Amino acid sequence: MTVAMAPVIPHAVSRQRTERLARSSKPFLARGGPRGERCAGCRLLPSHCLCALRPAVPTRAGVCLLMGDVEALKPSNTGWLIADVVADTFAFGWARTAVHPDLLALLADPQWQPVVVFPGDDVAPERVLTGLACNAGPAAPHSASGKRPLFVLLDGT
Protein backbone atom coordinates (compact mmCIF):
# COMPACT_ATOMS: atom_id res chain seq x y z
CA MET A 1 0.00 0.00 0.00
CA THR A 2 1.34 3.43 -0.96
CA VAL A 3 0.60 6.46 1.20
CA ALA A 4 0.05 9.70 -0.70
CA MET A 5 1.77 12.68 0.85
CA ALA A 6 1.34 16.37 0.28
CA PRO A 7 4.25 17.79 -1.69
CA VAL A 8 7.06 19.22 0.41
CA ILE A 9 7.53 22.96 -0.11
CA PRO A 10 11.16 23.52 -1.16
CA HIS A 11 13.18 25.20 1.59
CA ALA A 12 16.29 27.36 1.27
CA VAL A 13 18.77 24.48 0.93
CA SER A 14 16.54 22.67 -1.56
CA ARG A 15 16.38 25.85 -3.66
CA GLN A 16 20.18 26.21 -3.35
CA ARG A 17 20.54 22.62 -4.61
CA THR A 18 18.21 23.25 -7.56
CA GLU A 19 20.11 26.42 -8.50
CA ARG A 20 23.47 24.60 -8.29
CA LEU A 21 22.21 21.69 -10.40
CA ALA A 22 21.06 24.17 -13.05
CA ARG A 23 24.65 25.47 -13.33
CA SER A 24 26.16 22.00 -13.46
CA SER A 25 27.72 20.73 -16.67
CA LYS A 26 27.43 17.07 -15.63
CA PRO A 27 25.02 15.14 -13.39
CA PHE A 28 25.79 14.96 -9.67
CA LEU A 29 25.81 11.26 -8.75
CA ALA A 30 25.75 10.76 -4.99
CA ARG A 31 26.02 7.30 -3.53
CA GLY A 32 22.59 5.84 -3.02
CA GLY A 33 20.37 2.97 -3.96
CA PRO A 34 21.14 0.58 -6.79
CA ARG A 35 20.44 3.31 -9.32
CA GLY A 36 21.19 6.27 -7.06
CA GLU A 37 17.49 7.00 -6.48
CA ARG A 38 16.62 9.08 -3.44
CA CYS A 39 13.50 10.74 -2.06
CA ALA A 40 13.44 14.35 -3.27
CA GLY A 41 12.28 15.53 0.17
CA CYS A 42 14.71 13.85 2.57
CA ARG A 43 17.39 12.47 0.18
CA LEU A 44 17.17 8.97 1.67
CA LEU A 45 16.40 5.78 -0.19
CA PRO A 46 12.66 5.70 -0.94
CA SER A 47 12.29 2.67 1.37
CA HIS A 48 13.72 4.75 4.25
CA CYS A 49 11.92 8.05 3.57
CA LEU A 50 11.45 10.21 6.68
CA CYS A 51 9.33 12.97 5.15
CA ALA A 52 6.19 11.94 7.05
CA LEU A 53 8.10 12.27 10.34
CA ARG A 54 9.44 15.77 9.69
CA PRO A 55 8.63 17.96 12.72
CA ALA A 56 7.64 21.61 12.62
CA VAL A 57 9.54 23.36 15.41
CA PRO A 58 8.17 26.75 16.43
CA THR A 59 11.06 29.12 17.09
CA ARG A 60 11.85 32.81 16.89
CA ALA A 61 15.42 32.05 15.85
CA GLY A 62 16.58 31.92 12.27
CA VAL A 63 19.51 30.11 10.70
CA CYS A 64 21.75 31.39 7.91
CA LEU A 65 23.79 28.69 6.18
CA LEU A 66 26.89 29.71 4.21
CA MET A 67 27.76 26.72 2.06
CA GLY A 68 30.56 25.71 -0.24
CA ASP A 69 29.82 25.35 -3.94
CA VAL A 70 28.65 21.72 -3.98
CA GLU A 71 27.58 21.34 -0.34
CA ALA A 72 23.83 21.57 -1.09
CA LEU A 73 24.18 18.67 -3.53
CA LYS A 74 25.41 16.23 -0.89
CA PRO A 75 22.70 13.98 0.59
CA SER A 76 24.53 14.02 3.94
CA ASN A 77 24.30 17.82 4.22
CA THR A 78 23.15 18.58 7.78
CA GLY A 79 22.15 22.09 6.75
CA TRP A 80 19.28 20.40 4.89
CA LEU A 81 18.10 18.89 8.19
CA ILE A 82 18.13 22.32 9.82
CA ALA A 83 16.08 23.76 6.96
CA ASP A 84 13.63 20.86 7.32
CA VAL A 85 12.93 21.90 10.92
CA VAL A 86 13.54 25.68 11.20
CA ALA A 87 11.18 27.66 8.96
CA ASP A 88 13.36 30.78 8.90
CA THR A 89 16.41 29.15 7.34
CA PHE A 90 18.36 31.01 4.67
CA ALA A 91 21.03 29.39 2.50
CA PHE A 92 23.71 31.06 0.42
CA GLY A 93 26.61 29.80 -1.60
CA TRP A 94 29.86 31.23 -0.26
CA ALA A 95 32.89 32.51 -2.13
CA ARG A 96 35.57 34.81 -0.69
CA THR A 97 35.52 37.05 -3.74
CA ALA A 98 31.78 37.54 -4.16
CA VAL A 99 29.06 38.06 -1.57
CA HIS A 100 25.40 37.51 -2.48
CA PRO A 101 23.51 40.83 -2.09
CA ASP A 102 20.62 39.01 -0.36
CA LEU A 103 23.06 37.79 2.31
CA LEU A 104 24.18 41.36 2.98
CA ALA A 105 20.55 42.48 3.16
CA LEU A 106 19.69 39.66 5.59
CA LEU A 107 22.61 40.52 7.88
CA ALA A 108 21.58 44.19 7.84
CA ASP A 109 17.87 43.48 8.45
CA PRO A 110 16.94 45.15 11.77
CA GLN A 111 14.73 42.25 12.91
CA TRP A 112 17.77 39.94 13.18
CA GLN A 113 20.75 39.79 15.55
CA PRO A 114 23.35 37.76 13.61
CA VAL A 115 25.51 35.41 15.69
CA VAL A 116 28.32 33.43 14.03
CA VAL A 117 28.39 29.90 15.46
CA PHE A 118 32.04 28.98 15.75
CA PRO A 119 34.20 27.24 18.38
CA GLY A 120 35.40 29.72 20.98
CA ASP A 121 38.65 27.91 21.84
CA ASP A 122 40.95 30.31 19.98
CA VAL A 123 38.87 33.46 20.41
CA ALA A 124 39.44 36.29 22.86
CA PRO A 125 37.16 35.60 25.87
CA GLU A 126 35.27 38.89 25.49
CA ARG A 127 34.18 37.80 21.99
CA VAL A 128 32.70 34.47 23.12
CA LEU A 129 28.93 34.55 23.46
CA THR A 130 27.62 32.25 26.18
CA GLY A 131 23.95 33.24 26.07
CA LEU A 132 21.36 35.41 24.37
CA ALA A 133 19.00 37.84 26.05
CA CYS A 134 15.93 36.48 24.28
CA ASN A 135 12.62 35.32 25.64
CA ALA A 136 11.80 31.70 24.89
CA GLY A 137 9.01 30.53 22.63
CA PRO A 138 7.74 31.51 19.20
CA ALA A 139 5.10 33.93 20.51
CA ALA A 140 7.36 35.60 23.07
CA PRO A 141 8.03 39.31 22.69
CA HIS A 142 11.28 40.38 21.11
CA SER A 143 14.44 40.37 23.18
CA ALA A 144 15.64 43.44 25.04
CA SER A 145 17.38 44.54 21.83
CA GLY A 146 14.16 43.98 19.85
CA LYS A 147 15.91 41.50 17.57
CA ARG A 148 15.53 37.80 16.82
CA PRO A 149 18.68 35.64 16.88
CA LEU A 150 20.02 34.65 13.47
CA PHE A 151 22.58 31.87 13.85
CA VAL A 152 25.13 31.97 11.03
CA LEU A 153 26.67 28.56 10.30
CA LEU A 154 29.72 28.35 8.08
CA ASP A 155 29.49 25.64 5.41
CA GLY A 156 26.18 24.38 6.82
CA THR A 157 27.51 20.91 7.62
Segments (PLM) and residue ranges:
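Short Cys/His-rich Zn2+-coordinating modules
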Residues: Q16-G32
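Short hydrophobic beta-strand segments
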Residues: G62-A72, Q113-F118
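Histidine-anchored nucleotide/phosphate-binding helix
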Residues: A52, L73-V85
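Detector for small/aliphatic-rich hydrophobic stretches
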Residues: T2, I9-H11
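Short metal-coordination and nucleic-acid-contact micro-motifs, chiefly zinc-binding Cys/His arrays
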Residues: R35, L45, T59
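S-adenosyl-L-methionine/SAH cofactor-binding core of RNA-modifying enzymes
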Residues: A87-T157
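Short Cys/His-rich "knuckle" micro-motifs
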Residues: S47-L53
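Short cysteine-rich clusters marking metal-coordination/redox-active sites
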Residues: C39-C42
